[in-house]
Amino acid sequence: MNGHRTSKAAGNGSHRSGRRGSALVAILWIVSILSLAVFSATQFLFIELESDSNASAIFQAELLADRGIAIAAHTQVKKGDRLLSQSFRGGDSFSARISSEGDRLNLNALLENAEFDRIVLEELFYQWGLRRDEAVDVVDNLIDWVDADDQVTNVGAERSYYYNLERLNHPFNRPFDSLNEVLLVKDFEMVVAANPGWRQAFTLLSGGPLDINEAPAELISVACQCEIEAAQQLVSIRDGLDQTPGTLDDLRFDDVQAALDLLGIPPGFAEEISARVSTEDPAKRILSVGRSGSISVERSVTVQYTGDRGTIIHWASRRME
């Protein structure tokens, strides 16, 4: 009898030990899960804090870039002014640059007066690497895209060509609203292949003529139909002693004729050429970069001026990596 009770007691003790062991395992699992939850929550908190910090830095960089725009847009602030680049405590800074929107060829203006000005585009495309006949064909296609009629220019492309490609609403028969539209024109891919940076040569926002005080030698050469060496010499004189464009020692031409004389344009030809160039464009392009910590934000603004009053006609923003 005593042996039976002893055996039963031993059995009960074994069951209790088993239950305690199971409970311990369960507790360890719970502790592990809680530890994992705490770790995950901590990680999420760090991510959220980092995200908040980045958002704050982005916002600060945007404010700094906007400050640069506001200063550069003032009519009394000129290129090279020290106010255009400023640094602050903590490493924050902004840097703004002013340029003329007329330092690029106005594509719509050239096509509007295509009878006299198409030579500018033909010569530019030829210099970029197209054959003469290819350059002529591309310009024909550009003219047909913007003119109001459906008559083909030489061997250009009008509605029937695009219709056969199931592009039923092409061409638009109006001036370009965006440089992206130029990519829709027949054979323009040849220009893109020859010069992937072709956009840097064109604008749709200027007053029309090329700003001879700020345009690069390549564009002055094709617009004025002069030798590239003459255009390079003009740019060298224009850039002053430091040979750096956009600084305070730059020489500005106040008269188009003086610039054309320097380029060696014959008097009988100067009247036609003078319609393509100017000494100042009413639109200014302002590029401002704001920096806060490791974050940089770039604002690009084009301002159209009438006297001392400016109107923003283009605005773009991007975060720089």
Predicted regions, residues:
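Compositionally biased linear targeting/interaction segments
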Residues: N2-K8, N12-R16, R20-E321
